[in-house]
């Protein structure tokens, strides 16, 4: 099998762990490639490098890091339909499993085709600005104020039906995957990964009656940002772009999925309890 490994800023103890993982993969007869990004901080002249242009040959890609690395990996893969195995050596790693747990076992399971392939939906932004070459996000697309403490004013429509006008610091359009991220921090609910929904969550709304709305993921969201004298940001996961003046955007579910490799015994609610202390109560 052919596997690529992507990572960002791998130093110290992480280098030792990565060296051990590469040695294990080679021992199990994998052909291993490193991303150009990873080679900036982890250089091994014996291992070939890959770029976004030649990843279609891979059986899967290992995202070695935390959730930020996995989002970076998703950006590089895009529509290429390559499976991702998230290996957490970062802080939280909600979308990855901890490297210290079961790496060798899951590699054996992958060779035996004994794993679960979890399809995660994404959201896309239209129109595509000339400065935006990748208009999709696994977690969320957010519109956020930038240069001022003043609020921004966003008119929101779902399937051409007017919802309301948000006076706020911004607005988050989240997938089920992203429901445990930025949206959750802003008071949004948690959706299970297989949910066929999107979330609209305001950021610090001036109207206390405004809360998250759950809509079907077949819906098309139109946002009209009123003209103002300050810049604002449109962020897609970790990538941000600056806009000014009145703008109109369409946000909808992407026409492709991301495929995450999970152990057969993967339990979403166990992950919530373990990594977010969900339901933790000193009385239990």
Label the model's feature ranges.
Residues 1-60, 72, 100-116, 126-135:
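ATP/NTP phosphate-donor binding region
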Residues 10, 67-69, 90-92, 177-179:
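Short glycine-rich anion-binding loops that position phosphate/pyrophosphate groups of nucleotides
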Residues 14-15, 69-73, 180-185:
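Short glycine/serine/threonine-rich phosphate/pyrophosphate-binding segments
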Residues 30, 79-82:
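A short helix->loop->beta-strand "cap" motif at the edges of active sites that frequently abuts
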Residues 63-67, 75-76:
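N-terminal glycine-rich "phosphate-gripper" loop used for MgATP/nucleotide binding
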Residues 90-169:
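Catalytic core of DAGKc-family lipid kinases
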Residues 165-168, 173-209:
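Gly/Ser/Thr-rich active-site loops/lids in small-molecule metabolic enzymes
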């Amino acid at each position: 099998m052919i596997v690529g490994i992507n990572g960002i800023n791998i130093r110290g103890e992480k280098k030792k762990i990565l060296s051990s993982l590469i040695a294990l993969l080679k021992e199990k007869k994998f052909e291993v490639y490193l991303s150009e990004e990873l080679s900036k901080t982890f250089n091994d002249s014996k291992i070939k490098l890959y770029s976004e242009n030649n990843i279609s040959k891979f059986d899967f890609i290992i995202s070695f890091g935390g959730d930020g690395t996995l989002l970076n990996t998703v950006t590089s893969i895009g529509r290429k339909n390559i499976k991702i195995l998230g290996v957490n050596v970062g802080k939280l790693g909600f979308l990855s499993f901890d490297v210290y747990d079961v790496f060798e076992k899951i590699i054996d399971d992958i060779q035996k085709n004994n794993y679960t392939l979890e399809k995660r939906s994404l959201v896309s932004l239209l129109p595509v600005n000339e400065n935006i070459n990748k208009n999709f996000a696994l977690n969320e697309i957010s519109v956020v104020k930038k240069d001022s403490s003043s609020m921004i004013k966003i008119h929101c429509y779902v399937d051409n039906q007017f919802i309301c006008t948000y006076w706020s610091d911004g607005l988050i359009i989240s997938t089920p995957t992203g429901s445990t991220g930025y949206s959750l921090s802003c008071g949004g609910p948690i959706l299970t990964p297989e949910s066929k929904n999107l979330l609209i969550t305001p950021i610090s709304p001036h109207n206390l009656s405004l809360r998250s709305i759950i809509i079907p993921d077949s819906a098309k969201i139109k946002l009209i940002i009123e003209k103002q004298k300050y810049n604002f940001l449109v962020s897609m996961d970790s990538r941000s772009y600056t806009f000014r003046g009145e703008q109109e955007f369409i946000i909808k579910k992407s026409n492709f999925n991301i495929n995450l490799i999970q152990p057969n015994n993967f339990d979403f609610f166990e992950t919530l309890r373990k990594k977010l202390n969900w339901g933790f109560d000193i009385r239990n």
